[in-house]
Amino acid sequence: MLGVFGSQEIIYMTRQYMAGDTPWNSTPRQLNGRVVFAEHYSMHPGHYTFTQKLGIATKVDVKKMFGKTPAERKKEFAEYSTIRTQSPVGFLAPDFELETTTGETVRLSDKRGQIAVFMFVAMTCPPARTQVDLWKELHEKYDTKDVQIFFIYSRERHAGERGYRELKETTSTSERMTHARMLSEITAVPVAVDPIDERTLKDYGMVPNAAFIIDREGFLVFKSQWADIRKIDQVLQQLLVSEELNKTNQG
């Protein structure tokens, strides 16, 4: 498998593998009177296995990534950094109203009384594609009366590159919906579509594969720059346990 890569690509993947995951404290804390969790930030998906990273590298043009100009890198870094400033943990999450691939409407404020969990995805975002099957398992694990899990389809990330030759950049909401329906064909997790103006992505941070957890009252309690099913599951379990403890104490 390594034979398909050049020397720069091998160096890139080795750095990714050696870096590993960045530290994350899973202990819940109180903020503004509610249970919240530490954010997880990283410029690279360090929690993926080496095999997963190899799979990701087969889908993208690593040389193109290396060939970005300083201005392009600066813009990319600025966009990725918005996840740190947009929609802070412990505060009311920005509301949104999005159409799903089945013609229904997903409105975050309608999820009050339930925990909402979502990840930004795209057909040409290999880290997100790596997570899709894992999120299906998570979707099946939790009762929908308590936890609502869904994807938000946003901008394409590696359109036309090595693993996605047939997929082009979307220039309209209808084109984005077409790509989102392709994703719906390979997952049972509901897929909502962010319009081409990217209003939802801008509200939550311009990151390709970020994940968010909103509590029953509509407050953001966890966000991760790269979706990691293990962290998501851990936070959900602790949230539900905390709710049960509160009920017991109040009873």
Regions found by a protein language model. Give the residues of each.
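Structural microenvironment flanking redox-active thiols in thiol-disulfide oxidoreductases
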Residues: 129-185
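Short active-site neighborhood of thiol/selenol oxidoreductases, capturing the structured segment around
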Residues: 106-135, 148-151
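N-terminal targeting signals for export/organelle localization
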Residues: 1-97
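Thiol/disulfide oxidoreductase modules built on the thioredoxin-like
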Residues: 185-189, 193-235
